[in-house]
């Protein structure tokens, strides 16, 4: 066992750039169906089920490569990570369209993730938050809002 560990190659930044960043791309690279692609969560070690694998890609999250081992993030750990980051790295809150003043960018050009589940907000979700005057939070130098799924989960419509 120790001999095998000694010969493991370390990933360079160039290597990482060439590796798949989504589960769908990984499945295509391996030539297997997406449903057969089982990947452990980086945080809890549980293997993502098919629905979680689809959600991971839908949220536009990126695979984590450690040497040549791949990891993702399960649904529960996405929520836990979002909460941890919010509690530890919160910077500021703005309401609705004030995000454009705070960032200096148009709402169309601002990348925003859900503060609850880490999903990448689409333009309709961003405009909905602006129109309703909902808060946007700056956390770890990135903007967070609320996605349509979490908004309905918390009955905030």
UniProtKB/Swiss-Prot annotation:
UniProt source species: Human papillomavirus type 5b
What keywords sit in the KW lines? Answer: Activator, DNA-binding, Early protein, Host cytoplasm, Host nucleus, Host-virus interaction, Inhibition of host innate immune response by virus, Metal-binding, Modulation of host cell apoptosis by virus, Transcription, Transcription regulation, Viral immunoevasion, Zinc, Zinc-finger
Write out the function statement from the record.
Answer: Plays a major role in the induction and maintenance of cellular transformation. E6 associates with host UBE3A/E6-AP ubiquitin-protein ligase and modulates its activity. Protects host keratinocytes from apoptosis by mediating the degradation of host BAK1. May also inhibit host immune response.
The superkingdom of the source organism is Viruses
Entry's family note: Belongs to the papillomaviridae E6 protein family.
Zinc-finger (unnamed) residue ranges come to 41-77, 114-150
Q: Which N-terminal residues, if any, form the signal peptide?
A: none
Q: Which HAMAP family match?
A: HPV_E6
Protein name (Swiss-Prot/TrEMBL): Protein E6
Q: Which cellular components does GO assign to this protein?
A: host cell cytoplasm; host cell nucleus
BP GO terms, sorted:
DNA-templated transcription; regulation of DNA-templated transcription; symbiont-mediated perturbation of host apoptosis; symbiont-mediated perturbation of host ubiquitin-like protein modification; symbiont-mediated suppression of host innate immune response; symbiont-mediated suppression of host type I interferon-mediated signaling pathway
What GO molecular function terms would the record report?
DNA binding; zinc ion binding
User: What is the annotated localization of this protein?
Assistant: Host cytoplasm; Host nucleus
């Amino acid at each position: 066992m120790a001999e095998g560990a000694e010969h493991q190659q370390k990933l360079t930044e160039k290597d990482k750039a060439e590796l798949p960043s989504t589960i769908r791309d990984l499945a295509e690279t391996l030539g297997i169906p997406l449903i057969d692609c089982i990947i452990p969560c980086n945080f809890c070690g549980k293997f993502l089920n098919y629905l979680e694998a689809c959600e991971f890609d839908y949220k536009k999250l990126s695979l984590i490569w450690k040497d040549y081992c791949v990891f993702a993030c399960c649904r529960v750990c996405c929520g836990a990570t979002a909460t941890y980051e919010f509690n530890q790295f919160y910077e500021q809150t703005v309401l609705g369209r004030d995000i454009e003043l705070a960032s200096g960018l148009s709402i169309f050009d601002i990348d925003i993730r859900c503060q609850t589940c880490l999903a990448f907000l689409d333009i309709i979700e961003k405009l909905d938050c602006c129109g309703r005057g909902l808060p946007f939070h700056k956390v770890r130098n990135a903007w967070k809002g609320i996605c349509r799924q979490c908004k309905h989960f918390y009955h905030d419509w």
